Amino acid sequence: MKIRILHPSLCHVGGAEILMVEQARLLAGLGASVRIRTFAYDAERWAQRVGSIPVDFSKARIPGKRPPSVPRFPADRRMGFLLDDLASADLAIAHNYPASSALGAASKPRLRLWYCHEPPRFLYPDEVSPFLRQNAARAPSRHGPRYFRTSMKSWFGALPFVGRRSARRRAADRVGVRGLDAIWANSEYTRENVRQAYGSLDVEVLYPMVEFPNLPDRRGGLPRGGLGILTVTRLEWVKNLDTLLDGFALFRRRDDPRSELHVVGEGPARPALEELARQLGIADAVHFHGFLSDALVAELSSRCQLFACLPLDEPFGMVFPEAMGRGLLVLGPDHGGPLETLDGGRLGAVVDPLSPEAVADGLARLAKSSDTEVDRLRSAALDAARQRFSREATAKRMRSLLERYGMGF
């Protein structure tokens, strides 16, 4: 079976991009002939992870330079590069807009599939951000709600012809998506958002695949004081790091004055977040590491006990099952894909992500758990994550879905 996997850009390392590459490796391991096609490619960050899978790209990222620009809409004439050579394939899988609707408008190959990490937020801010839509008004000073109001929902974005979410662009996207042969979503939450954005479509859920390392047993509870807390995320406002910093500052002042927060990731909000840490008086306890390799993230994880991340309207969040697989106790938001991963709070603490007090209380609740409860929670979280997100579980589900379309290995 010949498979083409389409993605607009492989320059920064995010959950959607990691999942796309892992799916490509899984399909290749099942015996398919797989090629990845993307506009922009950063070999320094991706070559090792991609391995032997061929990558066709239009422009390479130059180290130290900004990533090359990529098409932002399916009508961009540069989309022709992404859709080239599809006639020779049996299956094409699009990841991320505008590859999704562009593939739906194409006539080849026989099976055109969109793996939906989330519908494009800038086109469908209300449909894809139900939590922010319902809660932005109660926390107007928080950066996430402010970003929702002033950027995602800006009046300029809705202007005819020139607006990013103009009626014309939304209509073109919907036509393309409805032309697809199949849609797979990364969570039940995303499936519902797809239906809110595009109407009543047949959407199947295929959970992302997570590699779980064979680590030493972390039984033995937690140290009582001086906890290491890890967060891994892109530093942008919808990831809600400002609330996490506020909550951590309160937790540190009230419950654990020797605790430290390790922030892994990069993004445009970093300078403002570093300044916020200084204003809160926790600059010495918050460590901004920037981008780290998988090996360095694993090493840092081994020195931490808790994982905390509070993204707003997160469709899935690869970092949550990854943290569970490393034996970290997990704190996440009370909605979206993370709530689904944490089984409604059974496998970790879930809190109101716009309340620093709730964040501090959640961290304290985990930190004060008995050793027996800590070990039970770690074991339950790891078992559940492996059952849903392991390579074996994903391969079994993927085979079943493809067989419905006469695609076998």
Name each model feature, range by range:
Residues 291-292, 299-304:
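Short alpha-helical donor nucleotide-sugar binding micro-motif in glycosyltransferases
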Residues 74, 372-403:
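A charged, aromatic-enriched C-terminal amphipathic alpha-helix characteristic of glycosyltransferases
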Residues 120, 131-183, 191:
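Membrane-proximal helix-turn-helix segments that form the acceptor-binding/catalytic region
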Residues 344-357, 364-371:
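Conserved acidic donor-binding segment of nucleotide-sugar-dependent glycosyltransferases
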Residues 184, 221-239, 245-248:
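Conserved donor-binding/catalytic core segment of Leloir-type glycosyltransferases
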